[in-house]
């Protein structure tokens, strides 16, 4: 089988003809030194801090609103229960009064 041009160049250059990734890895001590995420974080550290702060502030605001909504629902439910109890007692006393009136006549 006849060797291709890529095979010849690969053998002549030690197996890494034009391979920038291998050169970068060998040039740096840490394999994560040239990664894109690390560079992004280094360049935008203040932006990331502000973004996280805004997101946390928004979440805290939502939690406060939900807490007050929970309080409103609990208080409205308690008021409804109180009104229902009063209505039940009023109806019970009215029925009791009608029965007693009919019994005395």
UniProtKB/Swiss-Prot annotation:
Short name of any one Pfam family annotated for the protein? Baculo_11_kDa
Database matches in InterPro entries: Baculo_11_kDa
The family assignment reads:
Belongs to the baculoviridae 11 kDa protein family.
Q: What is this protein called?
A: Uncharacterized 11.8 kDa protein in HE65-PK2 intergenic region
Report the source organism.
Autographa californica nuclear polyhedrosis virus (AcMNPV)
